[in-house]
Regions:
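N-terminal secretory signal peptides that target proteins for export/translocation
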Residues: 1-3
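Bacterial N-terminal signal peptides
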Residues: 6-19
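Beta-propeller blade termini and top-face loops
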Residues: 23-168
Length: 168
């Protein structure tokens, strides 16, 4: 154990100083797909938690920062659709009606643009039955809907750290 600890800093230093060779071959894109670079909104950090295409072809993103952004592909333009959410990490858009749902830390929320200005002005709590604590690692991820209309997501659970994990 002592040898490992004395060698580790040297190995780490070497790894940080010696750059790894760059990959010379470009990534292969599967048939039927294309890659496109999309610039993010200026001054905005997009910690993307969910992505979904709307029926109009626009790309919607929800972020850990609690925002939902809409990217108009043809115009190459970003619009903020919703903000003030609590770590929105999953998004589902109805392919027929464009109804937009987001899962945030404590609930599934339906976002509605009631006046047609491109911004959600109604945040309707659709389901908030699972509870939430103040633990940093308690997240709600992903959002899918089955053919019967049921939503599914993934919940992280909080954990009292680290009493049980410490060795004596």
């Amino acid at each position: 154990m002592k040898i490992f600890l004395s060698i580790f800093p040297v190995v780490t230093t070497v790894a940080l100083i010696v750059p790894l060779p760059a990959q010379e071959k470009p990534a292969r894109i599967p048939a039927g797909y294309m890659a496109e670079k999309i610039e993010t909104p200026q001054g905005v950090s997009l910690g993307v938690g969910g992505m979904e295409f709307a029926p109009d072809g626009s790309l919607m993103l929800c972020t850990r920062e609690g925002e939902v952004w809409k990217y108009l592909i043809k115009k190459k333009q970003w619009n903020l659709f919703a903000d003030g959410l609590h770590e929105s990490l999953g998004l589902w858009i109805d392919p027929k009606t464009s109804e937009t749902f987001v899962i945030q830390r404590g609930e599934i929320t339906k976002l509605v643009d009631t006046n047609g200005d491109g911004r959600a002005d109604l945040y309707e709590s659709f389901n908030a039955g699972w509870g939430v604590t103040d633990n940093y690692h308690e997240y709600a991820f992903g959002l899918v809907r089955d053919s019967k209309g049921n939503f599914y997501g993934t919940l992280n659970t909080s954990l009292s750290w680290p009493g049980w994990a410490r060795s004596k």
